[in-house]
């Protein structure tokens, strides 16, 4: 699907909102489903939007809803936000999306749990001429014209940032015998997680090869099958083991992380979102293996929930990559308003940034 172009998204009101939003502390926001009804500025004509998020199980999504609410306040629009209990509840989310379409709103913002499961509903939205803006996760194979814009972090770049910081921290341990690096991804179905996981894998392989080391990627078939010129497991300098739990919970991510961390050759771990990073930290509560000392497993996380930030601050994690769910939710409402006003849309990319104990 060729992506369309958003020529007019950033009006003066949005620039003000961006500056205000960047100063907000979205990580600890607590929200509930329901309408956000406000009176604000902007050529909104009283639009009503439906928003379907991945879940409300983490502070990440609570921050996204805070951004949605902020944009509604500024534009004078309303938004009803729903989402399943967990990001692995794909069928529940599809039902919520179908219900949203049946309400014939002025637009729908969607953060898809599974990029393939929403193709049918997106076709229906297209037929009903309901604009859809995807945020947090794109839907690359969406029916042509169904998705007006996508507001996402450059997830491949963001995953690569973690590799760029983990690799130099463990480089001196390479070439002295086979070692293992673990990656825990909460799923293999959503575009953002899969792109982020592959971003870490590809960047790590690139850095290792540049220094003359070989890498063999093992574990979850979805990720292994995307690796080009995968190394030989028997002879590789580094085994990069990728694990995906059966469901997207911290507890199951912790089980996967424990399995890798208990192996004697493991020297590094990466949890590619808040749930999986907290899973790595939960595993460490029993194992006490994470840290930056020579005898510890170096680990990095993703997102900026309070548990992850505390682990970065005390040195349990080397650092983490952060993004702004608040601003993605915020941009999504502005994009829907622009679409409802007949403006042309383009994708809105946002970047990931590294933080550690020195720059928190």
Range-by-range predicted roles:
Residues 3-13:
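Sec-dependent N-terminal signal peptides
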Residues 3-5, 22-360:
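A residue-level marker of the well-folded mature domains of exported/periplasmic proteins
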Residues 17-21:
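C-terminal motif of bacterial Sec signal peptides marking the signal peptidase cleavage site
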């Amino acid at each position: 699907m060729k992506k369309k172009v958003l020529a007019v998204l950033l009006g003066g009101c949005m620039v003000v909102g961006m500056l205000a939003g960047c100063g907000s502390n979205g990580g600890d926001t607590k929200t509930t489903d329901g309408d956000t009804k406000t009176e604000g500025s902007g050529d909104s004509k009283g639009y009503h939007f439906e928003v379907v998020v991945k879940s409300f199980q983490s502070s990440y999504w609570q921050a996204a809803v805070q951004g949605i609410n902020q944009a509604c306040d500024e534009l004078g629009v309303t938004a009803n936000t729903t989402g399943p209990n967990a990001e692995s509840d794909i069928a529940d989310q599809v039902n919520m999306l179908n219900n949203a379409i049946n309400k014939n709103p002025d637009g729908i913002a969607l953060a898809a749990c599974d990029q393939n499961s929403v193709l049918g509903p997106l076709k229906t939205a297209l037929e009903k001429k309901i604009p859809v803006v995807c945020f947090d996760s794109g839907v690359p194979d969406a029916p042509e014209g169904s998705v007006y814009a996508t507001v996402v972090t450059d997830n491949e770049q963001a995953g690569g940032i973690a590799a760029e910081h983990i690799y130099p921290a463990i480089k001196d341990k390479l070439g002295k015998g086979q070692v293992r690096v673990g990656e825990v991804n909460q799923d293999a179905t959503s575009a953002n997680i899969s792109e982020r996981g592959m971003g870490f894998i590809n960047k790590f392989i690139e850095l290792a090869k540049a220094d003359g080391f070989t890498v063999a990627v093992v574990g979850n078939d979805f990720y292994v099958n995307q690796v080009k010129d995968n190394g030989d497991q028997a002879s590789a300098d580094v085994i990069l083991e990728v694990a995906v739990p059966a469901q997207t919970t911290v507890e199951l991510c912790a089980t996967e992380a424990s399995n890798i961390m208990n192996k004697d050759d493991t020297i590094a771990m990466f949890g590619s979102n808040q749930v999986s990073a907290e899973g790595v930290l939960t595993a460490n509560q029993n194992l006490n293996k994470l840290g930056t000392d020579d005898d510890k497993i170096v680990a990095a996380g993703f997102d900026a929930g309070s548990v992850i930030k505390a682990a970065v601050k005390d040195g349990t994690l080397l650092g983490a990559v952060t993004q702004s769910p608040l601003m993605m939710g915020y941009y999504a409402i502005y994009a829907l308003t622009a679409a409802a006003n007949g403006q042309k849309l383009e994708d809105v990319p946002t970047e990931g940034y590294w933080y550690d104990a020195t720059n928190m």
